[in-house]
Every structure is written in C-alpha cells, then in structure tokens.
C-alpha cells in the first residue's frame, strides 16, 4: 500500500473532539496533521454526519449556525462517507452481540474490518472491540497495557440460530450476485 492508498476509519468522537477544545485536543490535532501529511483518506459510515450533528446540538448545546459551521469545518477535510450494505448489516448485528457495543459503534468497526484499515476512536469500548485495529486517541489507554494486545471479550453470537437466517442469507447472496 502506498501512502496515497492509506486510509483510516474515524468515528464521530474523534471529529467532535477536533471541533471542541478538550484536554486531549492537541493529540487529536496531531493525528489530523499526520494524516494530512501522509495523504491519509479519512473514511466514515454515512451515519457519522448525523452522529456529529447530534453530539454537537444535543450533547453540547450548539446552535444551528454553530453546528453548520462545525460540519463545514469537517467537510473541508475531505472525509469520505460510505453506505453500508446488507452484508455489513449482518456483521454489525454480530459485532453488537459479540462485543456489547451499539450498532452505531459497530458500523465503524465493520467498516474498518471491511477496508482492512485502522480505526481512530476516543471510545474505550469500541477500541477494545477493535483490538489491534484500534487507534485509540483518548486519555490513558483503552483498558489494556500498551505492551500487550488487548483482550477482546466476545459473547456468543445467536443470530445464526434464527430459523429464517439461511433463507435470508440466500436472498442477500442472490441480490449481491445480480448486476447493478
């Protein structure tokens, strides 16, 4: 992979921290500078933008003009949005159950796994679920010593037990095989 091909999946927590003056903002800004220097493509699931708006407007009380300015600030960074397909939806269901994370967080994990890319986050639970793929940018560590790989505590996956799973998967495979 060349420098121009380098990608990072970034979750909304990193973007919101970049926009706000928080204690770990210098580390976040440093990561963005490095990504810019390296020509790294920042890729997010389409829902990223709604998460950013929600965090700023509801979580931090930003006015509409402040939210729009913030979204524009992120937009000029060239962040690329991706839609999830049905296969990624199934992987998301599995990740939610295995790692006990939200479906929104699982989208970032599945996108990073699909793209074989690192995933930048400030979310400790998401970083633990991502394991070696995580670029944890928050304070401290995500719950493990940096000298050893994180322990990923997975739970049993039950969705394959659904009696209609085989038929549904066959339908998805047939849809995927059809020319676009």
Regions found by a protein language model. Name each.
Residues 46, 68-98:
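Acidic catalytic patch
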Residues 2-7, 82, 109-153, 157:
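Acidic, PIN/NYN-like endoribonuclease modules and their adjacent C-terminal/linker elements
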Residues 14-15, 48, 88, 108, ...:
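Alpha-helix capping/helix-boundary segments
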Residues 149-180:
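Short linear interaction segments
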Residues 1-44, 59-67, 168:
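Short, well-structured N-terminal submotif of metal-dependent ribonuclease cores
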Residues 10, 43-44, 83, 103-106, ...:
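Short beta-strand scaffold positions
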